[in-house]
Amino acid sequence: MPALKDAIDRASELGAHSFVMGMPHRGRLNVLGNVMRKPMPLIFSEFSGTNYKAEDNQKSKNFDDDNKKWSISGDVKYHLGSSMDRTYPDGRKIHLSLVANPSHLECINPVVVGKARAKQYYCGNRPEDVRNVVPILLHGDSAFAGQGVVYETMQMSKVPDFDVGGTIHVIVNNQIGFTTNPIHARSTPYCSDLGKAFN
């Protein structure tokens, strides 16, 4: 998380004002709470599906337990996204967006890149506008090496109208893909070797 926060801080110093992030379930609650700074009571209310009443719950003393008990069900906590604005002490303002993600590993990659490209387009669609919006993708090591959508998304990186000027990829190299050891998960020494095809 410190590396992610530092990357955002440094990019904002260089002129970026919008960040679109996508990630798997592992570490998502940490990112929501510590990078996005989403209030913990709101995160926990989304677990139980009471988030639509979260603000009312905090303001009203008349919200009874029966209403909480029969509220709509919540989504899986590791699927939730968020969006927020942050102001730095020096006055810089940035917008952070963590895109909601289903359980299908890496399928969020083209969504994040597409959302970033759309934001760049609506910022003015000039070459210098590419710097304003930064896509950030977090991956597990096995998913990065093994899911075809990673390659498919990277393959679009230099295609006109799809180029976002680069994406920050953070790979959590925990060396186990569910129950698969690295030696059985890929044919290359490093999980990030796929990226060499696009340098």
Where are these regions (language model features)?
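Short, surface-exposed alpha-helical segments at coil->helix boundaries
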Residues: 188-192
